[in-house]
Amino acid sequence: MSRYRGPRVRIIRRLGVLPGLTNKTPQLKTNSINQSISNKKISQYRIRLEEKQKLRFHYGITERQLLNYVRIARKAKGSTGEVLLQLLEMRLDNIIFRLGMAPTIPGARQLVNHRHILVNDRIVNIPSYRCKPEDSITIKDRQKSQAIISKNLNLYQKYKTPNHLTYNFLKKKGLVTQILDRESIGLKINELLVVEYYSRQA
């Protein structure tokens, strides 16, 4: 399944707020939603499916990519669900988004693809690049690159930077300080339901 490129508001109306996908928050009609839910018996499969879809759309990855991350998480030590979230959160495109250097993860991915971003002083143009503690994230020393990201930082640094990241405005430098903990995830998600969804595939 390819990466979703359709209307983003339609997705968050169905799944809830997904800050990585869009910073828009649609106004929902509470009464009609409650009535719709009360008239339907939601299956356990659907509940797991929707949690899985939240991860996929929030992080902007394909079905195959998410399944691969689940398989990696299953082989790692610790809680499969927490390891899965750590793998997704440590992607370069997500790190750029969480630092406030881009308004959304698709926006961050575009910055990486267009070679605006350096990791440890080297250009990295792979959005899925897995960052690790002590990695530094900087902007290419080019006027266009600096202008784009400075504008984003002014608009989106209002969001709190998570505990595993820091950003130095004077040096225009982000730093991964540690592997994030569960409380720093910027998404309301039940990762155990996602693991259960893939239990027969991973």
UniProtKB/Swiss-Prot annotation:
Residues 90-153 form the S4 RNA-binding domain. CDD domains: S4 (cd00165). One of its GO terms (molecular function) is structural constituent of ribosome. It comes from the Eukaryota. It is found in: Plastid, Chloroplast. One of its GO terms (cellular component) is chloroplast. The keyword Chloroplast applies. Keywords: Chloroplast, Plastid, Ribonucleoprotein, Ribosomal protein, RNA-binding, rRNA-binding. SMART domains: Ribosomal_S4, S4. InterPro entries: Ribosomal_uS4, Ribosomal_uS4_bac-type, Ribosomal_uS4_CS, Ribosomal_uS4_N, S4_RNA-bd, S4_RNA-bd_sf. One of its GO terms (biological process) is ribosomal small subunit biogenesis. Pfam families: Ribosomal_S4 (PF00163), S4 (PF01479). Part of the 30S ribosomal subunit. Contacts protein S5. The interaction surface between S4 and S5 is involved in control of translational fidelity. Belongs to the universal ribosomal protein uS4 family. HAMAP family: Ribosomal_uS4_B. One of the primary rRNA binding proteins, it binds directly to 16S rRNA where it nucleates assembly of the body of the 30S subunit. With S5 and S12 plays an important role in translational accuracy. This is Small ribosomal subunit protein uS4c. It comes from Rosulabryum capillare.
